Amino acid sequence: MTQAKKQPTAPQEATSNDDTIIEELLANIPSTEDIVLELPSKNKFYTLMDPTKPITIRPLTFEDEKKMMSSKQGGSKMLNSLLGSCIKNINLSQVLQLDKLYMLMKLREVSYGETYQAKINCPSCKNDNDITFNLSKLPVNYIEEEMVNPVPVYLPVLQKTIKVKLPTIADEGYLVNSEIAMANLWRFVTEIEGHVNKRIISQVIQKLPLKDAHALLKVMGGDGLGIDTKVKFACSYCPLVEDMELPIGADFFTDS
């Protein structure tokens, strides 16, 4: 004789006492309020959804983390998806790359705290070091008030001035790797000595001397603007001390 399966029962309706208990149990939950972002660009080149309000960010939620863990997306697509869920008052596609990195650092900071632990293998003695970094201490270089976009760039070899627009999240497909980036440099140049014809621009950019190409790439890369992710690494096992990029691994958006 088979025993009938018990049907799952729904939780009973909450009472006022239940609500009080739940509120007490969650008393120490971190704030999920939106935090105003002081972007390196100072919002200077953006058309905000509501010009009377700032750009804000909220901490990641458990739901966000579940989506991240189950997502088949990786790299920039996954990071953009996270930012799209947490950033308010701006169309994500127009966010400058120099602001995106700042946003990612702040998203990690407001979600898990200002400290970030990473395991670094010493290039000298090969020992693993457990290092704690303080994300809130990373210096930020803000743009000058007089800066414009597109940015005028003087090419030292050609002795000509061009204007180049700063890359945004929408441009990431043109910057996947160095080969693709070099082939698409012309897309970011809006003017060469007053000439705006894209055919002329494309032909000139293809023939740029290396020094001039590097001058162009330097500006596109932010030229020192934005959050500085260079940190000092001091090995605990040997005398090595060196500057390095903040080691951002797959666990950056976890509670490490």
Annotate each predicted stretch with a short phrase:
Residues 1-256:
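Long C-terminal interaction/binding lobes of large macromolecular proteins
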